[in-house]
């Protein structure tokens, strides 16, 4: 029997519902249960693929090619369960589905309404595509009281009535602000948030109260009294110094125990969270430190590179060092000399991105790394800019550029018009829609024997996740290799360059895919582990 846990939020946004869901999933896994986590987003975009990273944060891509919310990255990193397209839905996707059904005549002439048609579609999503999971955790995006969230909250109210308390649990995450002038935590915002939820017909079973300090018993009792929940079900969600402390902290506060008691499940009181504590200890007590510059164009919001930042943390954990990140806007290097900003770093990483803005700055960062023998890691757009830099300054192609920026003299990077997905050929054109038309999801890549990446992966064939519509032009492969740039990873048909490297450089690798999406604290991605190791070596040479 699959049990459902719905996680809502109140008072303010960005309280950490995604991390709370991921941490609870990890705790239930530690108790031997199989879990799946889902995110219901109340915005009208069909998916976040066309949303600005500086508004929404990164787009997390799944193996099956879905562009999803960054919280699915937390779910994967904490539980190790690969997310699927069916694990993220938006209001836009729900409405598109309902309207398509209406056009087909599926509703047989009925007046299509939010209730029951939209809410039924939401319920179908929440309960579909399941196998033998013990728990499904559904996070409801947004904040209680937002007009956009109402159909989703109504849907979970109906699901609760249909399933009963035996199969469903509702958790409400809220905020207890501290008022310095009063010298106390205030419970009134939480009371009003729960009142708003009750007005929608939903009684939460557990309250998770975010706070930057311990919550006195008097406040917990007060919340219990006015919000109509048991005192034991008022769970402190205290701030921690690393997100990997969250499962340990929530277990200490009894979150997983209360969930199991709600469902009348047997419990092993000696829950082993040793591996989580080991990760926390390594983060808190590193044996050294390296500095890595991330040269990007969306650095005004670090969540634009959430998986990237976490993957570098994982690489640091694997090497027992702290990775200090220096976030640099690539446009700076189009106005100023890169030396001033980069001469003190131990590694340079240029992540993915879109458009011409800041591209020349990324090219300058790649040039600095190549000429100064500083470890360089180019991801997606960062690989393309590294290849353009090499072509201009080493291979004698000063007009090399990308067709993404116009009509270049030397079209070194161009729009992919077709590629193979499984056994099918996919075709695209320059006039196609932007949403959902990129090369998305996991693809196979063959690694060249005796290459650095072959040594790093320890495998001949790998599968990595992609999100791009431009690719290095394979017709220039021989010309660039003659000058020393190795194309060490290719698509199975040999048409799409996936990895380049400089064999004579200490560590210079560019990849067309996004390895950060598959890195986990207990299974760091080998490229990030190796990159941080190279940064350690470089730090000893300075």
Swiss-Prot record:
Active site as annotated: 380 (nucleophile), 514, 516
Binding annotation for UTP: 13, 186-191, 222
Keywords: ATP-binding, Glutamine amidotransferase, Ligase, Magnesium, Metal-binding, Nucleotide-binding, Pyrimidine biosynthesis
Residues engaged in binding CTP: 13, 146-148, 186-191, 222
GO (cellular component) term, any one: cytosol
Pathway: Pyrimidine metabolism; CTP biosynthesis via de novo pathway; CTP from UDP: step 2/2
Annotated region (Amidoligase domain), positions in chain: 1-265
Start and end residues of each Glutamine amidotransferase type-1 domain: 291-541
Enzyme Commission number(s): 6.3.4.2
InterPro entries the UniProt entry points to: Class_I_gatase-like, CTP_synthase, CTP_synthase_N, GATASE, GATase1_CTP_Synthase, P-loop_NTPase
Gene Ontology biological process: 'de novo' CTP biosynthetic process; pyrimidine nucleobase biosynthetic process
Additional facts recorded: CTPSs have evolved a hybrid strategy for distinguishing between UTP and CTP. The overlapping regions of the product feedback inhibitory and substrate sites recognize a common feature in both compounds, the triphosphate moiety. To differentiate isosteric substrate and product pyrimidine rings, an additional pocket far from the expected kinase/ligase catalytic site, specifically recognizes the cytosine and ribose portions of the product inhibitor.
Family membership noted in the UniProt record: Belongs to the CTP synthase family.
Record note on quaternary structure: Homotetramer.
Name of the protein: CTP synthase
Gene: pyrG
